Swiss-Prot record:
Gene behind this protein: rpl20
Compartment(s) where it occurs, according to its Swiss-Prot or TrEMBL record: Plastid, Chloroplast
Disulfide bond found in the keyword field: no
SUPFAM superfamilies on file: Ribosomal protein L20
Family: Belongs to the bacterial ribosomal protein bL20 family.
The entry's keywords: Chloroplast, Plastid, Ribonucleoprotein, Ribosomal protein, RNA-binding, rRNA-binding
NCBIfam families: rplT_bact (TIGR01032)
GO biological process, one term: translation
Keyword RNA-binding: yes
GO molecular function, one term: structural constituent of ribosome
HAMAP family per record: Ribosomal_bL20 (MF_00382)
Annotated protein name in UniProt: Large ribosomal subunit protein bL20c
Length: 128
């Protein structure tokens, strides 16, 4: 019985997977396929991880600017966010981090207004 070549279909499929895994030094299609599966799993995992990492970075930036001491002695990120929600000032953390990096004075202005309105509210309610 004579040998029949399969044609270009398998070669085209292997070339396509080897282009996806471009850094592959292996010529074995099995290793290339395994690398492709691992790369796709890593990219899927790291898309979710990237969201967490950026949120953590934004929180760290906001907290460092708030704790510099201009605002209040015991003021922290958690109290700042709590006061923002109490005043219904819904600014997301990405925007607050950009404000903290680009224009610290504006963030101090926001936090001082929050603290002043809290003091005024306590005075009018007779708490102090």
């Amino acid at each position: 019985m004579t040998r029949i070549s399969r044609g270009y279909i398998a070669r085209r499929r292997r070339r396509k997977t080897s282009l996806v895994v471009s850094s592959s030094g292996a010529s074995l299609s099995k290793l290339i396929t395994q690398q492709e599966i691992k790369a796709l799993a890593s990219s899927d995992r790291d898309r979710d991880r990237q969201k967490r990492d950026f949120r953590c970075l934004w929180i760290t930036r906001i907290n460092s600017v708030i704790r510099e001491g201009w605002v209040s002695y015991s003021y922290s990120y958690s109290k700042f966010i709590h006061d923002l929600y109490k005043r219904q000032l819904l600014l997301n953390r990405k925007i607050l981090a950009q404000i903290a990096i680009a224009n610290k004075n504006f963030l101090y202005l926001i936090s001082n207004q929050i603290l002043k309105s809290e003091v005024n509210w306590k005075e009018s309610a007779g708490v102090i």
